[in-house]
Amino acid sequence: QMVLENLHRWNINTDYLVTLDDVNTGTAHITLAEGDNSIIVLLGANARVDESIVDGAWDAISKADLVMVQNEIPLKTIGYITKKCAAAGVKVLLNPAPAADLEVEWLTQATYITPNEHELAALYPVNNTDDIIKANAGKIIVTLGSEGVAFGKDGDIHKVPSFKVQPEIG
């Protein structure tokens, strides 16, 4: 209930939010050390996001400019979302965190993929990450923690530095 109240306080649309009485919401516990974070994820109710929930929100999803999905819901549901969005022409940003084995089809169907360096290595197990980034120019944006992001464009690797933010608790 507290999470729902906070979403309302920030004017976040909760029309398609599903609450379950027998399980807590998913949470992520973040530790920060020297500009890099480590995240412990407890899936909670997120583990129950399934095709029926996606279908129940499909009217809104199908009209979206971009749908962001990450590995904090069941992998089967990620596959369902990417396939359905690709068929409808809806762009998908796939954040493959936490790292997991994803189907190649889902990676192909995603418009953008935003792994960190470890997730990139898990998705594309080759030695040269620069080659992966270049080969997927316009698709893969690698998050580099305190170093910013890297992406491929015009046969080169481009990096955008991060900027300092003040972590907030609440």
Go through each PLM region and give its residues.
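Residues that scaffold the ATP/ADP-binding catalytic core of kinase and kinase-like folds
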Residues: 40, 123, 152
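Conserved phosphate-binding/catalytic region of the ribokinase-like
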Residues: 101, 128-170
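Short, hinge-like loop/turn segments at secondary-structure boundaries
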Residues: 6-10, 32-36, 87, 109-113, ...
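Conserved beta-alpha-beta core of the PfkB/ribokinase-like small-molecule kinase fold
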Residues: 66-131, 147-149
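A short, aliphatic-rich alpha-helical micro-motif
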Residues: 58-62, 107-108, 134
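Conserved N-terminal subdomain of the carbohydrate kinase-like
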Residues: 1-66
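Active-site donor-binding loop signature of nucleotide-sugar glycosyltransferases
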Residues: 42-44, 115, 162-164
